[in-house]
């Protein structure tokens, strides 16, 4: 705990209070921020969590205070001022030989701290999912230091040359090189590939993947490099990670414990459920599907990506549907044919449509006792929301 408190829950709740028009509670929170919130504290904080929860929460509040009528005075600078104060502290994390941010920082000393675990390596997903908040802050302040520091991270990762767009889960802030071979889109791997920008985190340790953030960085900045990295990652995911279940032929996203070329593990974290929504965003460029069809860039590959997004969304919803409570577990181990778990060069691809029989689904979902808990993660809701907005298919509202 920090000596004077950092108000994690207060900051994280600001945008919710604004949307719900809880004016008295918001006024109390705002007064606390203005009078009590101080980042000059003798405290270590996680770089990633502080960026997405604290900085993201302040930036969300700043945006909504300008966008929603009656929320606060349009001249109220408190949220932006606190965001700038915090971001200036966070810049210390990027002061490494490679430009890859350290896992943590000491606030008052403004000093980056290597991870106490994982051999001191930084999480790839954490290092590559700080960009939306930092770039947005540069956009609204005119100070490009936040953009430049965050962009340098992506330049380093892109320069390493991940095999077919699939990045291992750890890299060194000292050398700027990957320190592991393991590839997964769940914990430690999800946001690189796709969470909403500037959404506060609702709880700590919300993990996401590089792929998720690649497409969202492209939609935020229109920088072609992020579209290229996203498309390469999607192709790699389709080639190396997507396998059907043994019985219902549901599409699942497996893991590569030993990297590209190794055998697959049929484990799928709830964290991976951002993927169908992100794939739909990438295929349609964020437009409704009916509008995207008329774009010159629309082709058979985009059709295939939308079909994959639909199939993966069904798998995600099934994780809830097959339990007696209707609540999904944290992890599912899927039934899969041994042939499908071999390396990509040994696997034959399957394009068979999945079954709609829930009785058949139940044979494919294996929930282990230690994984049978729910952390109220938002990934499935996000994908269902995006799939509804993009396809207008009412089934996604029903599932939601």
Q: Residue locations for each model-derived region?
A:
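Glycan-recognition and catalytic cores of secretory/periplasmic carbohydrate-active enzymes
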Residues: 1-400
């Amino acid at each position: 705990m920090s000596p004077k408190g950092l108000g994690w829950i207060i900051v994280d709740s600001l945008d919710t209070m604004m949307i719900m028009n809880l004016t008295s509670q918001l006024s109390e929170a705002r007064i606390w921020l203005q009078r009590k919130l101080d980042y000059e504290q003798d405290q270590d904080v996680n770089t990633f969590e502080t960026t997405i929860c604290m900085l993201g929460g302040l930036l969300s509040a700043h945006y909504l205070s300008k966008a929603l009528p009656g929320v606060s005075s349009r001249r109220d600078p408190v949220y932006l001022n606190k965001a700038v104060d915090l971001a200036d502290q966070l810049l210390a994390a990027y002061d490494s030989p490679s430009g890859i941010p350290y896992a943590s920082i000491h606030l008052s000393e403004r000093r980056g701290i290597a991870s106490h675990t994982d051999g001191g390596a930084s999480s790839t997903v954490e290092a590559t999912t700080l960009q939306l908040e930092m770039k947005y802050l540069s956009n609204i302040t005119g100070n490009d230091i936040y953009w430049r520091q965050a962009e340098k991270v992506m330049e380093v990762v892109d320069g390493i040359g991940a095999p077919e767009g699939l990045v291992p889960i750890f890299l060194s802030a000292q050398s700027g090189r990957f320190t592991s071979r393991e590839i997964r889109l769940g914990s430690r791997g999800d946001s690189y590939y796709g969470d909403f920008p500037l959404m506060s985190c609702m709880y700590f340790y919300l993990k996401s993947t590089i792929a998720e953030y690649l497409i969202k960085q492209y939609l935020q900045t229109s920088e072609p490099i992020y579209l290229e990295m996203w498309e390469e990652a999607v192709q790699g995911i389709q080639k190396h990670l997507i396998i059907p279940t043994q019985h219902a032929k549901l599409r699942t996203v497996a893991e590569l414990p030993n990297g590209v070329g190794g055998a697959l593990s049929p484990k799928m974290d709830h964290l991976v459920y951002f993927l169908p929504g992100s794939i739909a965003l990438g295929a349609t460029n964020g437009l409704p599907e009916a509008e995207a069809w008329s774009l010159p860039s629309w082709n058979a590959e985009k059709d295939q990506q939308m079909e994959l997004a639909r199939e993966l969304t069904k798998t995600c919803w099934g994780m809830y549907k097959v339990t007696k409570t209707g609540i999904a577990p944290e992890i599912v181990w899927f039934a899969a044919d041994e042939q499908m778990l071999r390396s990509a060069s040994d696997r034959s691809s399957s394009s068979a449509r999945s079954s709609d029989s829930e009785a058949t689904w139940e044979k494919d979902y294996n929930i282990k006792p230690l994984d049978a808990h729910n952390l109220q993660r938002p990934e499935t809701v996000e994908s269902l929301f995006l799939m509804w907005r993009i396809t207008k298919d009412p089934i996604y509202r029903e599932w939601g």
